[in-house]
């Protein structure tokens, strides 16, 4: 894989759908509907089994099946499959399954029970890279992994030919600070390695500041408004991108208060895209006043697609 460059799967808008459950089993019908909806929407890639897809709560057989369903129903849209797990041998097995399913790329976060060192993380990615014939996205998500990457660690991992993109946490919200932050990260990695942002409220600033990709929670359920932000930002239209993002401020506020997963699960349930109580236990969906507030925001913003 020497000389691999960023691919279509790791540029533009990447939509990460829920993996809805019904009676503690993956609701394949609902999941396929979500994937086909995304395939028709115009997103640049579909990210299966990300944090929004509850990968950490699914066993290997469930994850293999989800990967297969995603590729089968994504039409010609590239598919990124999450392969994160606690043990390296399990990650390698998941990488095998993802590639066998036809994934265009894989995404890996350094999951742990015992705290990991930087050397542990380099070893993980190096070991997994030997199994890959597709690009890999390094997933930096300290909110769930409790592991903090540094620019120096990005640089070490970017030496691996498999690494095509790094999914970074939200940059500072101010435009100039975001540009400076992203420029520092770009200086740490080769030009062939892209930078993608997670944290939907920061996406407009990050794309305008130099990120190549938005790895989006919102787009997995509501691709329409996410596409408005992404297309404007990637075209350099800061006014329209920021305006489109600012219109969603009530939704971003819900993300901040309840977590994006619970909010998009409620959105999907309210729109009939997922069954009630679609999250894996012990995660509880929003109820009562919190759920009613999500419905109020959906109605006020006319969010249906």
Residue spans of the language-model regions?
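C-terminal alpha-helical cap/extension of soluble enzyme domains
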Residues: 2-3, 12-19, 37, 41, ...
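Active-site beta->alpha loop and helix N-cap motifs at the rims of alpha/beta catalytic domains
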Residues: 3-148
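A general structural signal for well-ordered alpha-helical segments in protein cores
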Residues: 31, 63, 67, 91, ...
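Generic alpha-helical structural signal
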Residues: 32, 64, 68, 92, ...
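Alpha-helical structural signal in soluble globular domains
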Residues: 41, 65, 69-73, 97, ...
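Catalytic alpha/beta core domains of metabolic enzymes, predominantly
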Residues: 142-256
């Amino acid at each position: 894989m020497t000389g691999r460059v960023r691919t279509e799967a790791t540029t533009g808008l990447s939509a990460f759908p829920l993996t809805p459950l019904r009676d503690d089993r993956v609701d394949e019908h609902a999941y396929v509907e979500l994937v086909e909806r995304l395939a028709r929407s115009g997103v640049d890639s579909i990210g299966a089994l990300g944090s929004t897809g509850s990968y950490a709560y699914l066993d290997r057989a469930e994850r293999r099946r989800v990967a297969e369903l995603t590729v089968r129903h994504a039409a010609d849209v590239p598919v990124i499959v999450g392969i994160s797990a606690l043990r390296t041998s399990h990650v390698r097995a998941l990488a095998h399954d993802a590639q066998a399913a036809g994934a265009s790329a894989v995404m890996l976060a350094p999951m742990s029970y015992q705290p990991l060192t930087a050397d542990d993380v380099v070893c993980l990615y190096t070991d997994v890279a030997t199994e890959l014939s597709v690009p890999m996205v390094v997933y930096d998500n300290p909110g769930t992994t409790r592991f903090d990457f540094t620019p120096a660690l990005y640089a070490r991992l970017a030496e691996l030919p498999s690494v095509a993109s790094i999914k970074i946490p939200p940059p500072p919200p101010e435009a100039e600070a975001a540009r400076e932050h992203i420029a520092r990260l770009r200086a740490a990695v080769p030009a062939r390695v892209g930078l993608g942002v997670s944290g939907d409220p920061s996406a407009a600033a990050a794309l305008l500041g130099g990120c190549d990709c938005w790895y989006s929670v919102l787009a997995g359920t509501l691709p329409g408004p996410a596409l408005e932000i992404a297309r404007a930002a990637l075209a350099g239209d800061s006014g329209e991108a920021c305006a489109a993002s600012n219109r969603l401020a009530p939704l971003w506020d819900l993300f901040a208060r309840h977590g994006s997963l619970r909010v998009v699960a409620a959105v999907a349930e309210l729109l009939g895209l997922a069954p009630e109580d679609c999250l894996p236990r012990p995660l509880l969906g929003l109820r009562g006043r919190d759920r009613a507030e999500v419905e109020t925001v959906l109605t006020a913003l006319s969010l249906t697609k």
